[in-house]
Amino acid sequence: IRFNNLTLGYGTRTLIDSLTGEVRCGELTALVGRNGTGKSTLLRAIAQLGEIHSGDIFLNGKPIGDISPAELSTLVAFVTTDKVRIANLRCRDVVALGRAPYTNWIGRMQQLDNEIVEQALASVGMSDYADKTMDRMSDGECQRIMIARALAQQTPIILLDEPTAFLDMPNRYELCTLLRKLAHEENKCIFFSTHELDIALELCDSIALISPPQLHILPTEEMVRSGHIERLFTTGIVSFDPETRTVSIKEK
């Protein structure tokens, strides 16, 4: 994903201004920043679900405006923060929706498609839920099914908007470890927003940090040394120590 002088916002408000940089294949990149600074707006713009004020986004070297919806579905999979409840559809069938770009005009699944669906379910630890319906599952379980759908789509780019939001602590680390493995072993570009700074610092190759209206994209080690993370904490009550990579609350 490459950004060229990209400006995003809504109405007259600019959230991200004149962004130039890239999110690379083979890496897990976290998008961090305060609430309301444009994390979801940026992800939605990459997925052609939001407007661009100016500049451009390139996917695999091609301007996003020149990419058809059909082609985009083979390039980008997007997992949103929306709570999905599909009452009458089995989890296996929900994950199979990720194969839609590759099936024939009547949507018939081939043996390879079925194998990919089963592998996606196994990757997120949800094989035992394959025949259950999502209306009988927790938020975290539903989120994992939607991530499995994205994996089944087999795109080079995967976008996730706060994928760990409904997961407990062990599952947060397990999920991000899985995403890192996919990025490294399958050369995928995986870009996800998160408020889990500790996970981002430990597991991500690069960090994209929004400091309105700028967005800085750096390898994790460089981001730690850059001072950008410290500037997130502007109240004086909370501080970030780049040596220990920890956030602490100052005593009164």
Regions found by a protein language model. Name each.
Residues 32-34:
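The feature captures the beta-strand-to-loop junction immediately N-terminal to the Walker
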Residues 47:
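Helix-to-loop junction immediately C-terminal to a conserved catalytic motif
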Residues 55-63, 72:
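Conserved ABC transporter NBD signature motif
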Residues 96, 111-129:
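Conserved ABC ATPase "signature" region
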Residues 158-161:
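Catalytic Walker B motif of ABC-type/P-loop ATPase nucleotide-binding domains
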Residues 194-195:
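H-loop/switch region of ABC-family ATPase nucleotide-binding domains
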Residues 233-252:
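ABC ATPase nucleotide-binding domains
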